[in-house]
């Protein structure tokens, strides 16, 4: 069944004349499933090829999002505004697939070919692959921002401070099981050659960022303003991937479970560790001029990073 449900709520309230608050919440549920099968025939000069495949998959995901925003007029010269949000999204996916190739027509209904696979002549079979996978994960995120604006005098000189932060993290794990039989390739005992793989993958992630800025505006006469702004920001990112080969550690009929000694199957060549941090500064100064006929802006910005 394919399902898509969503529910939400919004709220706005004023507390007196100087403080207002707005918030929202949303919840979503998605569930999808599919079943497909395919049969192909290719007529080639070097020899005809026949193949069949089937796939069954289903997925389920949920998400919750909330946001809040507020504004506070402290006095005639000072205003504070802020907002924040939080979200999390768990998900789950499963799939089963099979495919096989032949050098002659298998002469069975392709929709039930794999159920009747043993009845197909061994002489026309080339290979067969059976695959199964399952993954689960969850991502989380929050962010907030606060800004303070202060008018310093009656001329309109203003000073502002802004602070922003966001953080996201998540973890995903997946199991994959595959078995491929090569009917034209024999092992040492004379049996059909078999390639078996059972892998576990874990992928934790984390991102964090901060931004702090200060800005200043000074009127110069009635038609011109001088403005200056400075911002500092930093961003951290971590993305790991750990892969474990379970083929020699778990029984062939066990799927989706970790044996006690699974860490001994760590595969360095299929794993990855990535960590990075970026720091940046930017300084911007400029002038604004406007009258009934003209509007002119001139600015200079500098952005060093490391």
PLM ranges: what are they?
Residues 1-306:
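Primarily recognizes Gram-negative and organellar outer-membrane beta-barrels
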